Amino acid sequence: MRYSKLFIPTMREIPSGINAISHILMLKAGYVRQLAAGLFIFLPLGWRVLNKINMILKEEMERIGAQEISMPILHPAEIWQETGRWYTIKEEMFRLKDRTGRDMCLGMTHEEIMTWIASKEIKSYRQLPQIWYQIQTKLRDEARPRGGVLRTREFIMKDSYSFDIDWEGLDKSYNLHAEAYHRIFTKCGLKYYQVESDPGIMGDMESHEFMAPTPAGEDEIVLCDSCGYSANIEVAKSELPTLPSLNFEYKEIYTPEKKSVKEVSDFLGLSEKYFIKTLIVISEKNGPVLVMLRGDQELNEKKLARIIGEFSFATSEQALEILGVELGFVGPVGHKIKKIADFSIQKEISYISGANKKNYHLQGIIPGIHFDAQWADIRRVKEEDRCPKCGNSLKIEKAIEVGNIFKLGTKYTEPLHAYFLDKDGKEKPIIMGSYGIGPARVAAAAIEQNHDSDGIIWPKSISPFDIEIIPLNMDDEKTVSIAEELYEKVTEIYNSFADRHMEVLIDDRDERPGVKFKDADLIGIPIQIVIGKKGLKENKVEIKKRRTKETKKVSVNKAVVEIVNSYYETY
């Protein structure tokens, strides 16, 4: 491909308010342009990268026996109504009516539609197992699209779905996908972790996410370097050291205008660990709920929501109305509303908390004696907490979710009547799994993990081109002749390892060398071949590796072999 014929609108100045490195570099290097909030146009270079990623996806899906199909983006509402998600998914779903007034939606995922076709066509155990997949557009009305292509309103997704006769079959399909995902992300050049995750709207069974660590990530993952424990912070667990008891006398203590745990602990000269933090929330399902954690711990809202459903924190007015107590002095003793206490509160230890009386706290509170509660893990794991598996220190990293796998069981097959007859002629629901990868997120994560001050450094497997030839003097006949000769020869070389020809970009623009060098580093092709009059005086061309910036001069007659060798040596 000739640079002069390719549309690569590089930018020098980036609009303000853009922070993610991948967003900045995709704009600067001419890979994407933004149409509106959360809507992006993939330009030729960007589309080539997505196609490279999609090729890897297809190769690995076919390797596990998955069959490619294509589902509509426009869905009739009644299918979503049968599973209940029409009602539980709120503003994120694009909804519309057709000209007859029929309710429709734009697909944000395809569990319902895939299950619908399975319900119509799969009738016998002889037709199972099945794995179907597609690489197709999804739409989600994100409240705050951000991070460039990391969180958008329209995106491409590889989504696959497994259908099995039993739970053992689902385990096999789930593991096949996990193994395929490891191969996919390794081939794409990503550093990643497979972590335990919250299934969210997908169900309530086992699920994992594949996370690419980067400071630009909007997720946080908890990791143990000692044993390999890994989990999204939304579900992560940790152990806390046993707290020695101070055996407080059970009595009220005067704490004038001291409302927060820190204020009271400083006032009394005691560690926050000896306090019970008492929160009041309003649950859509349960109404008012008292939530208790050890004073030095923070609430994990996702964990609590899995227990009580969606909730909001009570205002001062609501607290007074419900409990007759001002916020800051609420405690767990004496209230008859639902209570949930975190495991960080030890049952045999005496604590201090609000006395349910303005300007007073109560000390000597012993859980199980002075109050009862539902006990649960509702706290947020912190850096340096102890690993729940091996007891060593945990660390927390930011990461980008690039893929996920879910065990769905019969969550969709039962309401949509996707049943089959087993060997004994008994009707049973199909057991289902769902698996997704976002190609644009993979591309963005690759940039976040592979860049420098000059631009992108593509892993060679997903680079838009393999090699860039850079003739420096387009008015010099010999320079142009050698560049064209190398362009033809390298393009024709059959790459037996990748089962394809080398894809070569030649920068045939009549531009200054500095401009060509700057653009080459910006767009990030792995190997650069520099051809100039100075080198040709010695009958040599220069090979530069974009990642290491290592250069070497090779003779023109050996250049083709050296170029190919350099390509295979690079990452």
Swiss-Prot record:
Q: Name one GO molecular function term.
A: proline-tRNA ligase activity
One Pfam family recorded for the sequence: tRNA_edit
Could you give a single Gene Ontology term from the biological process aspect? prolyl-tRNA aminoacylation
- Source organism's superkingdom? Bacteria
Q: Per the record, what about its domains?
A: Consists of three domains: the N-terminal catalytic domain, the editing domain and the C-terminal anticodon-binding domain.
- Family indicated by similarity: Belongs to the class-II aminoacyl-tRNA synthetase family. ProS type 1 subfamily.
Protein's name in the database? Proline--tRNA ligase
- State the species of origin: Thermodesulfovibrio yellowstonii (strain ATCC 51303 / DSM 11347 / YP87)
Upper classification of the source organism reads:
Bacteria, Pseudomonadati, Nitrospirota, Thermodesulfovibrionia, Thermodesulfovibrionales
